[in-house]
Amino acid sequence: MCRFPPGDSALYLRVATADALILPMRLLDSQQVALAQQISQYSYGALYGFLLALIAYNLMLYAGLRETSNLCYSLYLATFILLNLSYTGHAGAWLWPDSLYLKRYSTLLLMMALAWTGLRFARHFLDLASHAPRLDQALRHGSRLAVLLLILCVLADWHALANHLAFASVLLYTLLMVAAGWLSLHHGRVAARYFLAATLCGMLGTALTDLAVWGVIPFNPLTYRAVDLGILLEASLLALALAYQMRQHQQARRQAESLARQDPLTGLLNRRAFLEQGQQLWQDSQRHARNISANGD
């Protein structure tokens, strides 16, 4: 806490860093500081609690259904939580307080991890391998190459190059997510509507935060936390997309089972229905020692 004498005071700060730096300066009294801390704690608690609940829900779905999309989505959300903890400073204070190396590179590594897990989720959820195999291959090999390049920069301690690579990858990742959603929607994937809307929300939130950090638009708590609001909307819409996709799979399975029992043209029961009903009749006859007969004409 700083104390200033009555009247005007001049306070000079010199800050230098290779990373993007947010330095909002405000003079607050003790009550205002306590209120700001309380608002920050509640807002981050709500954000992390909501995302952790979605992670737990999708992990349970993956355990029961073995759908890769649910696992990829959980990894994507977990990566965003770690990234948020890193760039807000919480991870540096709680998880690696004594590691200057991790403090320098954790945000950049997690930015790349977010792009990689997001593209992996998009590839599986949109099933790009079936209707856009070239795009699927490009996303898979391109994301791996970007990860390897960033790891090389970190190991060689090329901080400036790693910084540019991470930010460029996140920007490209956002555009690729929108492009993948649009292409899948063009190919008739109904669930892609939710995916496209979700990625647009995330992109808008990220853009507002970036513009605020760069000084293009006014910097305030709303514009700075726009990325958090965007990810909340994105996570909600993607959860709806996964639920819609699961409902589609259930309807397709029920339809396949119905077609396996009944001929769609004649409406007559087919072999599977005969075996199911005949097996039950046979078991009843054996249990009660009754004779049965079948007419093959």
Protein language model regions, located:
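Soluble non-transmembrane domains of integral membrane proteins
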Residues: 1-41
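Juxtamembrane interface at the cytosolic side of transmembrane helices
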Residues: 56-75
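First transmembrane helix
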Residues: 38-61, 168-181
